[in-house]
Amino acid sequence: MISTENLTKRFGRKTILHGISLRADAKQITLMVGPNGAGKSTTIKVLAGLIRPNSGTAHVNGFDIIKRRIAAQRSTAYLPQRPSFHPKLTCLEVLRFYAGLRGVPVSRCEAMLQLAGLGDAARMHTEKLSGGMRQLLGVAFLLLADAPVLLLDEPGLSLDPGWRKWLQQKLRFEAERGKTILVTTHLIAEWNDVADRCLLCRHGVIERELDPRNLPDDFDEIDSSTKRPEFTSIEKELTRNGGLFSITR
């Protein structure tokens, strides 16, 4: 389970998170959607323990991310939007290194590569991987430790539709096994049949919850659904006229 209360985060003078409060439950896939700069990726990084919030609280698998930082991090697996690996190591070598850090039997590494469709690339150096293969290696990392909480930031952007569908089905399977899964995405319509909940993030807060069974194709449709009816068919033009402002309909 994931829970946050009034999380804030500033970078210099710019505030990115203005009070994020959310809950994601076990056995569910929770989406976080919203425009660029809404705070989705920052929230994921806070939960993964990569950056520290300025205020607020967050718990991952029951552990406070500040007071029980190590326990919280061991409870999570994180897939960044653009996974990066040591360029001179092979896929199998980097996975074995990660397995050692997480206390996972190295015998699982080759099985994870096979699962992610990278069995034939096990001894390929990561610098030679395509964007899609790099993303799949990230998925192998995500699943290797069998962590109870999975955090995914824009998964599948580098994957073709077939592999994106495979990833969604795999995450559905992991949720049914009891995992808590939080996903940020711009490909919102593709998750209609997969997600259990969908949170709309905008301006550093969770604005509202959307129906995951009826997600639109893009954010313009979300925006139009939230406008007041009297303004949807009115085109306003603000012009300066003799020092006065007038609105022309």
What are these regions (language model features)?
Residues 96, 100, 106-121:
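Conserved ABC ATPase "signature" region
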